[in-house]
A protein has these predicted regions:
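C-terminal subdomains that position terminal phosphate/3'-OH groups for nucleotidyl transfer/ligation
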Residues: 239-265, 271, 275-304
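Glycine-rich, Lys/Arg-enriched anion-binding loops that position phosphate/diphosphate groups
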Residues: 170-268
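NTP-dependent nucleotidyl-transfer catalytic core
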Residues: 1-215, 277-293, 301-398
Length: 398
């Protein structure tokens, strides 16, 4: 590889946890072509700051002159235990498109060449559907189950659609004509046969070629574990959260002094703030101190070292992370404020829950309590006590 190809390769490979079959990409770069990479996202819950990871990777891929496609996987949102009901899925796809575009633009990368494809636009074609049937006849039920174990919601009497999900995701590589698929490391079992069978083993069964796979690390959540859309509102930061909400959530986050592992706050610095700072051109993370010069970092290794020594304490780290996140999210929020369409689609994609007003139960004190109106007394007395049998039943069942 010449130095230009090497620089492109390094950008593609940066900040990854795993890169499978890199030789596929190397060959394309040596031939001075543009690798075609796709990232799929099931259009379900509201995207949180964890979406910065794929978005920053997409920004790097665009800079490395890759052809990038974002698959708005509406059908997958529905196949996965109905996480996104069919009637909301279209609006959610538009919401995701706006979010991903704004995320990539927030680090100054042009999105005019970023391609968006809606899953349902090709996953219902006769060719695609026939491939689903062919693959379903060649892949065992247990392999499909294992492949989806970390991605598809696991329930007792799971719907059959959860077994189709991995088959469709694997076929997308072929039908989107990709050289490489990007995903979080949680997608690993869908990507490779080690330890389970999926894309790299299933595609050749239909005569299709094996693709490269690039995997982002998973962010630790603010409560310590992997960040997920199904976390409670306090454990994840929504991209449209106000500065106060961001500060409050980070302040509450689990962040033990000197402990670097599974630390959600440090995970933000490592996986979001540094890669974004590099794309933004300054490459720095600053921590202000009250009585001393600010600490200025240019690598996560230095940050972790100082944190382990308690020179960088949770008390000074947290406000620095809040401030940096708020300024990183500012252009996304400005884009939202400036777009009446986006605001309208938000309401349609995530309709506020209908609150059933609680009607205050008026205690039935009967008609004989002191002060009861005399005229009510008679008819009430004449009526048989309707509640009595239920009350008895409830008592016996206790
Ligand atoms: N499995 C991805 C979504 C996805 C769907 C289809 C694909 O082809 C790729 C990715 C997720 O967890 O969100």
């Amino acid at each position: 590889m010449d130095s230009e190809a090497q620089a492109r390769f390094d950008l593609i490979a940066s900040n990854l946890q795993e890169f499978l079959n890199p030789e596929i990409i190397e060959k394309i770069l040596i031939e001075k072509r543009s690798p075609r990479v796709y990232w799929g996202t099931a259009t379900t819950g509201r995207p949180h700051i964890g979406y910065f990871l794929p978005a920053l990777k997409i920004a790097q891929l665009l800079k490395a002159d890759c052809e990038v496609t974002v698959l708005l996987a509406d059908i997958h949102g529905f196949l996965d235990n109905l996480k996104a009901p069919l009637e909301l899925v279209d609006n959610r796809a538009i919401y995701y498109r706006n979010v991903v575009t704004a995320l990539v633009q927030s680090v100054g990368v042009d999105t005019s060449k970023l391609n968006f494809v809606l899953g349902s636009s090709y996953q219902k074609s006769p060719e695609y559907v026939m491939d689903v049937y062919r693959m379903a006849s060649m892949v065992s039920e247990s392999a499909a189950k294992k492949a989806g174990a970390e991605v598809v919601k696991q329930t007792g009497n799971a719907p059959l659609s959860g077994l189709l999900y991995p088959i469709l995701q694997v076929l997308d590589e072929q039908h989107l004509n990709a050289d490489c698929q990007l995903g979080g490391v949680d997608q690993r079992k869908l990507f490779t046969h080690n330890p389970y069978s999926a894309a790299t083993e299933w595609l050749p069964k239909l005569g299709y070629s094996v693709r490269a796979h690039i995997m982002n690390p998973m962010m630790a959540g603010l409560g310590g574990q992997k960040m997920s859309s199904s976390d409670g509102a306090d454990a994840k930061i929504d991209l449209l959260d106000t500065a106060e909400a961001v500060a409050k959530k980070i302040k509450k986050a689990e962040c033990f002094p000197k402990i670097v592992e599974d630390n959600g706050v440090l995970s933000i610095v490592e996986n979001i703030l540094f890669p974004a700072a590099v794309l933004n051109g300054h490459g720095e993370f600053r921590v202000e101190r009250r009585d001393a010069e600010p600490l200025v970092y240019t690598s996560i290794a230095q940050v972790k070292e100082d944190y382990a020594k308690d020179l960088l304490t949770p008390q000074i780290l947290k406000p620095a992370v809040s401030a940096a996140m708020v300024s990183l999210m500012a252009p996304i929020q400005a884009a939202y404020e400036a777009s009446a369409d986006w605001q309208e689609i938000t309401l349609k994609a995530y309709p506020p829950p209908v609150v059933h007003k609680k009607v205050k139960k008026v205690k039935d004190r009967g008609s004989r309590f002191p002060g009861a109106k005399q005229e009510n007394a008679k008819p009430e007395e004449a009526k048989p006590a309707e509640d009595a049998p239920t009350e008895q039943l409830a008592q016996t069942s206790i």
